Every structure is written in C-alpha cells, then in structure tokens.
Amino acid sequence: GLKRPQGMSEMRDAGKRWVNFPEIQAACGVKIVAPKLENAIAGTTLHLANTSEQKAEAEQSIREEWRGIYDKMPIMCSVCKKVSPRVEFITNCQNGTCKGAIEEKDGVVIKADTVGGLEALAFELFKLKIPVRQATVGPVNKKDILMAKSIQDPLNQAILGFSTKPNTEVADELSSDESEIAFFSGSIIYHIIDAFEEWRTAKQEE
C-alpha cells in the first residue's frame, strides 16, 4: 500500500493519520507498506525492476549511491591530520602530498533515520573539521557503542543521532550518568551540534 500523511500532518508526526493512494508522484513523502521491507533504508532511491536485468541495474545503482555517501564522509589523514571528505583525502593526501597516508581510525559515530539526514549531519561535522568514524542509518545499537568505545581520542567518543533513537538493548546504557559514551540526539541538527560542541569544550577543560 502507498500512504501519505493526512492534511498538513508531517511525515514523522502523522501517527495514525494516513491516507491510502493508488499512485504517487515523484519527490513526495510516502509510506510504503509491503512484506519483506525489514532491510529497506529510508531516504534511498526507489527502483522498479520487472526483469533480472533491471534488478541488476538497480543493485548497481544502489551500490553507486552508497559509494557516493561513503566518499563524502569527513575523515582525518594520518600524516597531516587534516580532516576532509574521503574522496579528497585519497586525491590530495594519499595520492598527493602525504605519501603513504592512511585513514585515521578516529572520529565520532553518526546515525540518522534517512540517508539524507546522514549526509546533512556529516556535512555539518565537516565544517567543524570533526572526522566521522562510522555512519549508518537506523536506531543506535550495541555495535555503534562498541565502535565509539574503540575511539582513542576522548573528544570523539560520542554518538550523534539525527531523528533516531537507541534501541531497547542500549537505551538504558546511553542514558546512564556512568555511560562511557556521550550521546546526542534530536530532530534539529544544529541543536545536536551545539550540544556536542559544548560537551567537547567542557571535556577539554577537565
């Protein structure tokens, strides 16, 4: 089924206020109800495949889409310590002035409910020259916490979530005052970034 929010309701706040549609136009918010969508990722391109060839083309397109997102993530060069999008790091550092450079295994963990949200959060972090160690769509889970704990720089031992929350397995751990990992989440990116920067400043003054 194809559903859109009723009236002026927002996608995230529609609750049970949804209206069925026989068809939809491009570039509109839509909720798709169908079987076997457990691994679908919100915000990605919707492909229609009626043949095996079309399916193969769609799969290749999806891989390229994810590759584009991967290349945009800000990372730190092991030699010059400059933070830049991964594709620029390869061009300017690995193949340029910093021969033998590798990607520093440092940076924050970011989460979002859609691919677009992930890109937006990564872009704001890049402007602050903060590297991203891992970026994935969906609720915060145990693997995300383990990744954040493995970061050596204490100023980057944090998880930033845009419009996403921890799953039930890790919710209590992240909300605890004794949590080893700082967790910042919300539906407004600038509020998340501001809270994160305040935490880093306080951390530096300890």
Q: What are these language model-derived features?
A:
Residues 1-206:
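C-terminal effector/interaction modules appended to NTPase cores
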